[in-house]
């Protein structure tokens, strides 16, 4: 009865007669009606969206800012620096984060996978990600997957031109539309372009957006770590991992940070 009384006294029911509330079956008593409606609301709710979403406010934030309402995926209510206070800046940064997260996920896979295959007997010529590009300046040029019968690149200018044309076309279609029709949302599949049907189920699609942004953020941190490893150790991520597992005392971030001398 206490729960029912609270539900009836909330702003949701203010100024409304209880008898007007819809129900799938005949009920008796105000308490039962209010409890059914409350349960339905919780059932369709998501832990990742809305005011009751999962939050991380950090050590310097007492409460979530008013402009972070949980409308977008990845909003944990934390913005100590006020980066999202301006709506236009927030929209721009949100797009940049999603796009960079996707590239980082592809990049992290591209850094690890060739090295993994090379360590299992597959010949790549050069499997370490930050050394691979320099092969284009070698006599034999850069061979895709180490196979001369595939893409055989010998001109860095030609690669640059292909990248500009292909990536520019894809980005142009993403923002302004293309042969498939107008763009519904420049950030996510849907409308004329959704070959996998990801947007067919709205609830599942909303959850996929959260998974994407979380994995994208992790991938961006991973890529930053790969860059630091390349500068400090001159090795790929899997080789660094193998060295750490073989000798964790001498091969770790603290050991390298205290002994690292730039240029040596």
Curated annotation (Swiss-Prot):
PTM remark: Photoregulated by reversible phosphorylation of its threonine residues.
SUPFAM superfamilies assigned to the protein according to its UniProt record, in alphabetical order: Chlorophyll a-b binding protein (SSF103511)
Localization (cell): Plastid, Chloroplast thylakoid membrane
Single Gene Ontology MF annotation: chlorophyll binding
Binding site for chlorophyll a 6: 244, 253
Sites bearing N2-acetylarginine, chain numbering: 36
Coiled coil: none
Modified residues (Phosphothreonine): 38
Residues bound to chlorophyll a 1: 78, 84, 97, 217
Cystine pairings recorded for this chain: none
Residues annotated as binding chlorophyll a 3: 135, 145, 212
Binding site for chlorophyll b 3: 155, 171
Keyword Chloroplast: yes
Transmembrane stretches, start-end: 98-118, 150-170, 218-238
UniProt-annotated binding residues for chlorophyll b 2: 102, 151, 180
GO biological process: photosynthesis, light harvesting
Amino-acid positions noted as binding chlorophyll b 5 in the UniProt annotation, renumbered to this chain: 163, 260
Pfam families xref list: Chloroa_b-bind (PF00504)
Protein family per UniProt: Belongs to the light-harvesting chlorophyll a/b-binding (LHC) protein family.
Domain commentary: The N-terminus of the protein extends into the stroma where it is involved with adhesion of granal membranes and post-translational modifications; both are believed to mediate the distribution of excitation energy between photosystems I and II.
Function: The light-harvesting complex (LHC) functions as a light receptor, it captures and delivers excitation energy to photosystems with which it is closely associated.
Subunit comment: The LHC complex consists of chlorophyll a-b binding proteins.
Protein name: Chlorophyll a-b binding protein 2, chloroplastic
Species per Swiss-Prot/TrEMBL record: Hordeum vulgare
Gene that produces this protein: CAB2
